[in-house]
Amino acid sequence: MNAQPLLPRIQSPADVRRLSRAELKQLADELREFVLQSVSRTGGHLSSNLGTVELTVALHHVFDTPEDRLVWDVGHQTYPHKILTGRRDRMSTLRQLGGLSGFPRRDESEYDTFGTAHSSTSISAALGMALAAQQKGEKRHAVAIIGDGSMTAGMAFEALNNGGMPHAGRVPNLLVILNDNDMSISPPVGALNKYLARLLSGRFYAAAREGAKSVLKSAPTLFELARRFEEHAKGMVVPGTIFEEFGFNYVGPIDGHDLDALIPTLENLRDKPGAQFLHVVTKKGYGYKLAEADPIAYHGPGKFDPQIGLVKPATPPKTTFTQVFGQWLCDMAAADPKLVAITPAMREGSGMVEFHKRFPERYHDVGIAEQHAVTFAAGLACEGLRPVVAIYSTFLQRAYDQLIHDVALQNLPMVFALDRAGLVGADGATHAGAYDIAFVRCIPNMSLLAPADEAETRRALSTAFAHDGPVAVRYPRGSGAGTAVETGFETLPWGRGEVRRQAGGHVRGPRIAILAFGTLLYPALAAAEKLDATVANMRFIKPLDAALVEQLARTHDALVTVEEGCLMGGAGSAVLEALQAAGLQTPVLTLGLPDQFIEHGDPALLLAACGLDSAGIEAAIQKRFCASAPSHLRPVANG
C-alpha cells in the first residue's frame, strides 16, 4: 500500500481515473474511514454510504463524469460521491443550515446530475438523459444506480419497460445498476458469478450471440430453441430473466465490494451499446462491524463515538409523536380485531416495530409502493376491516390519485397517520411535510386533524378510527410539549376546536384571536401572553369549526391563523373561506410556510426563519395590527 494518503489528493474524479488498481483499493479504504469519521461528527446516513464506497470509486474511475451522467436513486448513499467530487472539505456542514445537503442537488454540484431523495426515480431520469444524448448526437453514458428496495415501486418497472424498447430505431445507451444490499433476490456470489459477469459483459460473447442470432433467424424453430436454451442456461446461475424480458442485457450478480470484479465489468458494459443491467451485491455498513451487525440502527444515526458506537442516553428523551402513534396502534389493535396496519417500507420510522411483533398477521409492509399501499388498504376496508396507513406526509404525495379515486370517492373508513408533517429538519425540502393540508382538505369526504401535542394526538387517532370515512391525522417528527398521554381511547368532539386562552377584558390595542393548527399552538400561546391575545386550538382543519371561527371573528378586531404547512390552500385559506361564507370581513393575518422550498437545518432554526416561533408570531402580529386603535369589543366565554 502507498504510504502516503491518497484521499487528500483527490480534488475531482479526474484524479480517481489516474489511479492504479492498487491505489483505488487504498482510496476505497481511506474513503470508508473518512465517511465513518465524518458522519460520527455530524450525524446522517451511515450504513448505506459504507456499502457504496467501492461502487462509487469504480464508477468515477470508469466513467467520464460529469460528462457521463450518474443518477443515484434515493440519494442518501451519495456521501462517497460528494467526497470524490470536490466537497470533502464541506462534509463537516452536512445536513446543517447553509451546508451540504444529504442528497444530490443540481444546484450544489455539476456532478449531481439529478436531484433525488424519494425512491425509484433514477431509471426514468437516466433514460431521459440517454435519449436526449441520442437525439442530440452526443456520445455520453447515462447510469442509474438503484437499490433493491426501490425496485418494489411500480415507477422503476415502468421505466425498465420503456428503457429496453427501441426509440427512433434503436435502444438507448442506458446502464442500470441494481445495488442489492439485502441479499433478497441474490444467489451466493462466488468465482462462477464473477467469471460469468465478465463473459456476459464482454465483446466476444456479444458478437457471438448476435452472429448466432442472424444465422438462426433463418430457421425460426431453431432460433426459438436456442433462445430458450440461453435463457435456461443463464437462469441456472443468474436471476436476470425478468430484466432480459424488458430488453436489457443482464449481467451479475457480482460482489459490489470487489474492485477487481467491478472495474472490468463496468468497462465492458460502458463499451456496449443498448440497454445494460448490472446486478451488484453489497453489504450495508460494510467495513464497520457495528453497522454491519445492525444496519438499521446505523441507517441514520446522530453523533456518536465510532470506537464505542451508539449509546442510549442516560435520561430517556421525551416521548415522540411517532411513539405515541405506535403505542396507540398496539392498544387499539388489542381492543379491535378488525384493525390492520399498512406501511410502505417504513416500519421503524413510523413506529410499528412493536405492532409487527405483537400482531404479525395484521401487519402489512408492502415495500416502497405508496400507490399500492393506499389501494391495497382500500380493498381491506371494502371487506369490513379497519386499515390504518402509516405514511410520511411527503410520501402520501406519491399516492394522490389513489387517495382521491380509490379511497375518498368511495368514502371508505380508513385512517392515514401522517408522520413528519411540517418541517423535518436535516432531510430538507424533499422530505418536508409542507403540502398535506392543502392537498388533503380539497378532497371531498376527506377529513384532516392537526393535534397540538402528544396527548391530543392519541385522542385524534381514536377520533379518526371511530369515524365512518377517510381521515388523516398529521403530526410532526420528534417530540412535542411533553404532555402526559393517557391509555384510553377518548375521542375529540367531531369538528370542534377549543379556546385555550382568553384575552383580558381591557386590552390596550386591538383584540386579537390566534387560531392555531397543530403543534404551533404552544408558540402561539407564548406569543399571546405578551400580546394578551385569545388563542384557539383548532384541532380540525377539515371539517373546520366554522362556528368557533365566526364567534371569534365577531368578538375580536382581527384573526391570525398559524400553521406548519404551505399557506396556499392551507388552514388559513379555510378560515378565510369560512368568513366569506358567513359574510364577515374581519381582517385576517395568515402565518405559515412561505412559497418556497425550505432548506435542511435544525428544526428550531428553520421554524424561526419562517417566523413561526413565538418571537416570529408576536413580531408579525405587532407589525400588522398593534398600531391600530384600541378595541371596544367584549370577550365571549369559551363554549
From Swiss-Prot:
UniProt KW Iron-sulfur keyword: no
Binding of thiamine diphosphate, residues: 76, 117-119, 149-150, 181, 288, 370
Cofactor section: Mg(2+); thiamine diphosphate
Keyword Methyltransferase: no
Pathway the protein acts in: Metabolic intermediate biosynthesis; 1-deoxy-D-xylulose 5-phosphate biosynthesis; 1-deoxy-D-xylulose 5-phosphate from D-glyceraldehyde 3-phosphate and pyruvate: step 1/1
Xref: InterPro entries: Dxylulose-5-P_synthase, THDP-binding, Transketo_C/PFOR_II, Transketolase-like_Pyr-bd, Transketolase_BS, Transketolase_C, Transketolase_CS
Binding annotation for Mg(2+): 148, 181
Catalysis: reaction(s): D-glyceraldehyde 3-phosphate + pyruvate + H(+) = 1-deoxy-D-xylulose 5-phosphate + CO2
TM stretches of this protein: none
One GO molecular-function entry: thiamine pyrophosphate binding
Gene3D superfamilies: 3.40.50.920, 3.40.50.970
Pfam family, one: DXP_synthase_N
A Gene Ontology cellular-component term: cytosol
Keywords for the protein's UniProt record, in alphabetical order: Isoprene biosynthesis, Magnesium, Metal-binding, Thiamine biosynthesis, Thiamine pyrophosphate, Transferase
Cofactor detail note: Binds 1 Mg(2+) ion per subunit. Binds 1 thiamine pyrophosphate per subunit.
EC number: 2.2.1.7
GO terms (BP aspect): 1-deoxy-D-xylulose 5-phosphate biosynthetic process; isopentenyl diphosphate biosynthetic process, methylerythritol 4-phosphate pathway; terpenoid biosynthetic process; thiamine biosynthetic process
Highest taxon, organism lineage: Bacteria
Matches recorded under NCBIfam families: dxs, PRK05444.2-2
General function of this protein: Catalyzes the acyloin condensation reaction between C atoms 2 and 3 of pyruvate and glyceraldehyde 3-phosphate to yield 1-deoxy-D-xylulose-5-phosphate (DXP).
Subunit structure: Homodimer.
Protein name: 1-deoxy-D-xylulose-5-phosphate synthase
Annotated source species: Leptothrix cholodnii (strain ATCC 51168 / LMG 8142 / SP-6) (Leptothrix discophora (strain SP-6))
